Design a protein with these regions (language model features):
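Gly/Ser/Thr-rich phosphate-binding loop
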Residues: 236-244, 253-326
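Conserved AMP-binding A3 loop
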Residues: 28-30, 153-177
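ANL superfamily adenylate-forming
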Residues: 108-149, 256, 319-320
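Conserved AMP-binding/adenylation subdomain of ANL enzymes
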Residues: 76, 176-193, 201-240, 255
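AMP-binding/adenylate-forming catalytic core of the ANL superfamily
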Residues: 65, 86, 103, 356-364, ...
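Conserved pre-ATP/AMP-binding loop-to-beta segment of ANL
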Residues: 139-157, 164, 187-193
Length: 532
């Protein structure tokens, strides 16, 4: 297997097959990589040789971003993917923490830099005449270095769902490793077209999208994700493969279904964090196979599904993946299920997903030894994700380590409750999280987004919960907020910390309440003991 991005790209330098499709234009691999080589040569020529050659990208999902990625690979310097949804001092902080000496942006994002202190950072607008002149004047590419597999290719910031984003050092070897695996798994060839609509500054797009195209020679169709525009794009570009992360499938399924939705070229959708129901429904509606797994930006834990995967499970882990009690640093016993399928031993079975073999491919967080140390303890990698595993090794997610709820003296996690709520047909998206209980501990709160044209009454919701034999009475949401949308990261991951901080102070939608020991829901403020 090819060991670096640099080697992968060099193999395609003379390839006349299509590489990039965007709008009405098509670039061959030869054209795409020739442009990338000039791009890299220009940046290396103007770089400060006394500083790390870190090039930031504040760019959208466009050919310019693909060129910047290829240029970094060919040129042997480090690319820093800057989150385009960050603003103000948070944005400046990311650029600074990544030690960017050069920042590439475009007309769509240039204004985000206005007023920011970016001293020591040279900014180029790739849509400007200045950049065209700099790039055109570049000579032949002499790489900054010939990279080794373990060298850093990109700094990619985590999504920030549970705290401030951290810059993960992504090694060159991770890209060909991921790409070769997915190419083999899904039989991707140069005749395929990879639809890249997830943010290219994020690991999902890099590992589950870009890597697939590089490893197979397939064409890439970069796009900004649009639920209503997805089908038209698939048909326009002849896209046969797409990657996703977070809730895009739910957004697409919320759009009205057409009689010919399955008339499209899509063959495979691969990603993570989709709801079980959405996986099946997307596959049915669009005539494609959906493979959903588990992964993280750090790349230290890999869990994959196969055809035998039971409902609710994300799959089995690679060797070394286990569930550990983080306090005792011992492996948790297998999950035990009662007669109706409910987890009977949550306090013992739920633990943190770890890699007992160590860091795996995780290269640490750039310039953040403390955060790296929190992940690497006792010779193992601790993921921060809660889960339990059955006797056959199938893993079921339970939430993040910060999502434990203490309800009436019982420990609960959020993911199992969310999986049950997803069974209710009107619900399109759901988030379960903790809010303070007026007496002691936590109260369960659920935020719901309904499907297009769907309706839900307090009576219907309560009746549904009562009919779920595997839902503990203590797991019934005390508060239910029905809203039009939920706060998400740039990668469509729900920001539960924002929801928890908001609590009951909602300014839109409908808020329901249930008495502490009752089963009936009513509008908040209209029933007895709303805070009891």
């Amino acid at each position: 297997m090819t060991g670096t991005v640099q080697q992968l790209l060099q193999m395609r330098i003379d390839d006349p097959a299509p590489a990039v499709k965007y709008g009405d234009r098509v670039w061959t691999w030869r054209e795409h990589l020739d442009e990338a080589a000039h791009h890299a040569a220009a940046l290396i020529a103007v770089a400060d040789v006394d500083r790390p050659l870190h090039v930031g990208t504040l760019l959208g999902n466009t050919p310019a971003m693909l060129t910047a990625m290829a240029a970094a690979g060919l040129g042997g310097y480090v690319l820093c993917g800057i989150n385009t949804t960050r603003r103000g001092e948070a944005l400046a902080g990311d650029i600074g923490r990544a030690d960017c000496q050069i920042l590439l942006t475009d007309q769509a994002h240039r204004g985000l830099l206005d007023g920011l202190d970016l001293s020591g950072v040279r900014v180029f607008d790739v849509d400007s005449a200045q950049w065209a002149q700099v790039s055109a004047g570049a000579g032949e590419l002499i790489p900054h270095r010939t990279v080794e597999p373990g060298d850093t290719f990109m700094l990619i910031f985590t999504s920030g769902t549970s705290g401030e984003p951290k810059a993960v050092q992504v090694a060159h070897m991770m890209v060909p490793f991921a790409g070769a695996s997915l190419v083999q798994r899904f039989s991707i060839t140069a005749a395929d077209v990879c639809y890249l609509s997830m943010p290219l500054f994020h690991s999902n797009a890099l590992m589950a999208g870009w890597s697939v195209a590089l490893s197979s020679g397939a064409a890439m169709a970069p796009a900004t994700f649009s639920a209503s525009g997805l089908l038209d794009d698939l048909r326009r570009y002849g896209a046969t493969y797409m990657n996703y992360v977070g809730k895009p499938l739910a957004y697409v399924l919320a759009t009205p279904e057409g009689p010919d939705d399955a008339d499209n070229p899509l063959r495979v959708a691969f990603g993570n964090e989709a709801a079980e129901r959405d996986i099946a429904e997307f596959g049915r509606r669009f005539g494609a196979t959906v493979w959903d797994g588990f992964g993280s930006t750090e790349g230290a834990v890999i869990i994959t599904r196969d055809g035998q995967c039971p409902t609710g499970s994300v799959g089995r882990g690679f060797p070394g993946v286990a569930i550990y009690n983080p306090d005792t640093v011992t492996e948790c016993p297998p999950a035990v299920f009662d007669a109706v399928g409910a987890l009977a031993n949550p306090d013992e079975a739920i633990g943190e997903i770890v890699n007992t073999d160590g860091a795996g491919m995780f290269g640490g967080y750039y310039n953040d030894a403390q955060a790296t140390g929190e992940r690497l303890r006792h010779g193992m990698y601790f993921s921060g994700d809660l889960a339990y595993r059955d006797a056959d090794g199938w893993i079921y997610l339970a939430g993040r380590t910060g999502e434990w709820l203490r309800v009436d003296g019982e420990n609960l996690t959020t993911a199992p409750i969310e999986r049950i709520l997803h069974r209710l047909a009107p619900i399109n998206r759901v988030a379960v999280y903790a809010v303070p209980d007026p007496q002691v501990g936590d109260a369960v709160m659920a935020a719901l987004v309904l499907g297009d044209g769907a309706a839900l009454t307090p009576q219907d919701f309560g009746d549904f919960l009562a009919a779920q034999p595997d839902l503990s009475p203590k797991a019934w949401p005390r508060y239910v907020w029905i809203t039009d949308d939920l706060p998400v990261t740039a990668t469509n991951k729900i920001l539960k910390r924002t929801l928890s901080a908001q609590g009951l102070e909602v300014t839109s939608g409908v808020l329901w309440h249930r008495e502490a020991r009752g089963g009936r829901y009513h509008p908040f403020g209209s029933g007895p003991s709303d805070l009891a």
